[in-house]
Amino acid sequence: MKRLKNELNALVNRGVDRHLRLAVTGLSRSGKTAFITAMVNQLLNIHAGARLPLLSAVREECLLGVKRIPQRDFGIPRFTYDEGLAQLYGDPPAWPTPTRGVSEIRLALRFKSNDSLLRHFKDTSTLYLEIVDYPGEWLLDLPMLAQDYLSWSRQMTGLLNGQRGEWSVKWRMMCEGLDPLAPADENRLADIAAAWTDYLHHCKQQGLHFIQPGRFVLPGDMAGAPALQFSPWPDVDAWGESKLAQADKHTNAGMLRERFNYYCEKVVKGFYKNHFLRFDRQIVLVDCLQPLNSGPQAFNDMRLALTQLMQSFHYGQRTLFRRLFSPVIDKLLFAATKADHVTIDQHANMVSLLQQLIQDAWQNAAFEGISMDCLGLASVQATTSGIIDVNGEKIPALRGNRLSDGAPLTVYPGEVPARLPGQAFWDKQGFQFEAFRPQVMDVDKPLPHIRLDAALEFLIGDKLR
C-alpha cells in the first residue's frame, strides 16, 4: 500500500508541479532591479515578517515555503539578488545597480492546493518560478521588424526636432556629403554610427525613453561588431526613395541597409526566439513621474516609447508578432513605479494616467483574451507619509532623504494628472518630483513596499491555488 501511495505521489508530482516563466522589463530608470530584488525578498520571508496580505496564498496560509534553487539555463547570467540586497541594507542605503542585459533567478514555492481534485492524493504542490530580467530597450526594437531601412530612417530623422535636434547636430554634420551610391566607406560609416550611438546615449542620460536601436546603448558582447555600425539615412527625400532602394550592398546606402536587415534578423528576432517566446507572463514597469518633472518633450517621448512598446504586445491574429512568434503570454501587468514618491492621495491618479497611456493596447489585449491590469506600486518604500501645517492648512507630505546628498526632506510633490496632461498643466508646472534614496532599514526585516503583494497576486496568485 505504501509503495502504491509513493507511485501515486510520483505521478501526481509530474501532473501538479508547475513551471512559470515571468518576464520583468521596463522603460529606462523604472526600477526593474529593485522590483525583482524586493519581490524575491518578500517571498523568501513569508514566515519572517513579509507583508503580503493581498497575495491570497499567504493570506489563506496556503504558501508553505519558498527557497532559491539553481536555474535551468546555465547560459543566462544569474540575477544579482544578494548584491542588490546588500546595497539596499547598506550604510548609507543605495538603490541596486541596474542590470544591463538578460539575467535570471529561480524560486521553488511550496503550497497547499485548495481546488485541485489531486489534493485527495497529494498534500502539497510546487510552483517553479523563473524570473527573467531584460532591458526595455530590447523590447522597443521589435517594431523595427515591421519596417524596412528607409521607412525606419524616415521615422528616426522625423524625431530630430527640439532637444533631439540639438543633440544630433554632430551626427548630421558627419553625414554631410555622404553619397549613397558611392562605394561603401566602412571607416566613415563606423564613425557616423558612433556619432548616432553617442546621440542615443545622450538621449538616455537626459531621461528620454524611445531609443533605437536598443542594443546600441546596451551592446554587451556585440560592442564593436558591424551589426551595430549603422544609422538612419539622413535625408531620404533628397535622393529619392526609389534610387536609395536600388543601391547595391557595396554602396554606402546599401551597406547600411544590409546591416539594418542583419540587426533585425539576427539580433532582434534572435532575442525574441531565444527568450521572449518562452515567457508565460510579463510585467512592464513605468516611471511616469520623472517625465512629468522634465517637461512635455520628455513626457511625449515616454508616450511614444509606450506606443512602440505596445506594438510588441499586439496580439491580433494578423500581426507580425503573432505570425513570427505565436506568443503564449496570458497575463500582462503594467505598473506605475515609485508610488512612494507621491502622496497617497495621488496614487489613483498615477494609475489612471498609466491607463490613459496604454488604453489602445488594453482594448486589444481584452479582445484577444489576454488578462491585463494596471496598478501603482513601490518595490521598496523610500518615504513615510504624514501631514504638515502650511499657513494653517493641513496638507499631505512625504518625508525621506534626497537621493543626491542624503539630506532629510519633507515635501509635497504636487498633483499627478489623472489624464494625459495638456498645455495648461505644463504652463502651471505644479509638479516637483524629488528622487529619494532608500530609507535606513533593519537588516533582519523584509524590505518595506507599497502594493507589491497586489502585483504578485495578479502575476502568480492563480498558480498557487
Language-model regions, residue ranges each:
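Short, conserved secondary-structure transition motifs
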Residues: 335-342, 375-386
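Glycine-rich phosphate-binding P-loop
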Residues: 22-40
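Long, charge-rich C-terminal accessory regions
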Residues: 369-372, 384-404
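Extended oligomerization regions of viral-like shell subunits
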Residues: 362, 366, 370-378
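Conserved beta-strand segments of the P-loop GTPase G domain that flank and frequently precede/overlap
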Residues: 23-25, 284-287, 333-338
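Short secondary-structure boundary/capping segments
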Residues: 39-44, 144-149, 299, 348-354, ...
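Switch- and interface-adjacent substructures of P-loop NTPase systems
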Residues: 7-11, 16, 42-328, 343, ...
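GTPase G-domain guanine-specificity segment
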Residues: 341-366
